[in-house]
Amino acid sequence: MPFTIDSARGIFPNTLAADVVPATIARFSQLNAEDQLALIWFAYLEMGKTLTIAAPGAASMQLAENALKEIQAMGPLQQTQAMCDLANRADTPLCRTYASWSPNIKLGFWYRLGELMEQGFVAPIPAGYQLSANANAVLATIQGLESGQQITVLRNAVVDMGFTAGKDGKRIAEPVVPPQDTASRTKVSIEGVTNATVLNYMDNLNANDFDTLIELFTSDGALQPPFQRPIVGKENVLRFFREECQNLKLIPERGVTEPAEDGFTQIKVTGKVQTPWFGGNVGMNIAWRFLLNPEGKIFFVAIDLLASPKELLNFAR
């Protein structure tokens, strides 16, 4: 039987992803708006003690500036209500604007909002605010996660806020940065993997060369981000790269290559990914599971946030 996207998802089935992450996000989403906002605030304060968060790029903040000015112009009660509306996914102009932003703009918005709260320009979480028992349990779970898993939980928590009227709504993303100059690129090497397609995938993504990167995929190829359904088709995958993968640093370490049915090849690579938000402070433990067609094009690649560092050495089928 020829591979389908669904059957391709089953390659290297023993890869153990960090299922605690989507479980924690689901528990977070069930909290009331006040607890969600307070938990985000407490978690970011806690992370700030041990991690250096990079300031968002000017392009991201320019696109969020009007919304931030709008909130600053409100009274304290209105400010609190506006933030609660975001958490409640209320149908308001601000929530619709927020939902149209790419994840990086949303992260930049909350980063700047946190600064404004610290500076007294936006109503802070009330002093002495007591989290509910459920919220305290979620916070305790987050505190027990590895730093890369903490980042993923908090990122997804704010990315899912706002109000989306429909799938075809307007999308706003920061400008795509130009690809790194070819002469200044550093090529990766992967212990156990010499496949040119996989190596070029890593190199082009590290260089923000998304137009070259997407040509490694088949026309009906798919990419599955952590804890999400596959994104199918070159146009959709390219949009994902441009909106969510700018300035990532992929550090693949080792891998294994195996033949699959119908002349396909399956390759698993493990390593780390650093984000522009935390740089070298945090390396998320990642597995890439590639399925290449007989012509060497990417039919499917899954990106898994691993359950623990020991999974970096797990290549069992």
From Swiss-Prot:
What does its PTM field state? Proteolytically cleaved into a red 16.7 kDa form named red carotenoid-binding protein (RCP) which lacks 15 residues from the N-terminus and approximately 150 residues from the C-terminus.
Knockout consequences: Loss of NPQ induced by strong white or blue-green light, cells are more sensitive to high light.
Which SUPFAM superfamilies is this protein grouped with? NTF2-like, Orange carotenoid protein, N-terminal domain
**Residue ranges of coiled coil:** none
Q: Which domain of life is it from?
A: Bacteria
User: Which residues constitute the signal peptide according to the record?
Assistant: none
UniProt-recorded Gene Ontology molecular function terms: chloride ion binding; photoreceptor activity
Keywords recorded for this protein, A-Z? Antenna complex, Chromophore, Membrane, Photoreceptor protein, Phycobilisome, Receptor, Sensory transduction, Thylakoid
Where does this polypeptide localize?
Cellular thylakoid membrane
Describe its function: Acts as a blue-light photoreceptor and photo-protectant. Essential for inhibiting damaged induced by excess blue-green light via a process known as non-photochemical quenching (NPQ). In the dark or dim light the stable inactive form (OCP-O) is orange, upon illumination with blue-green light it converts to a metastable active red form (OCP-R), inducing energy dissipation, quenching cellular fluorescence via NPQ. One OCP-R molecule is sufficient to quench 1 phycobilisome. More OCP-R accumulates under high-light and low temperature; in the dark OCP-R spontaneously reverts to OCP-O.
Q: Which family does it belong to?
A: Belongs to the orange carotenoid-binding protein family.
Q: Name the chain's protein.
A: Orange carotenoid-binding protein
Q: Which organism is it from?
A: Synechocystis sp. (strain ATCC 27184 / PCC 6803 / Kazusa)
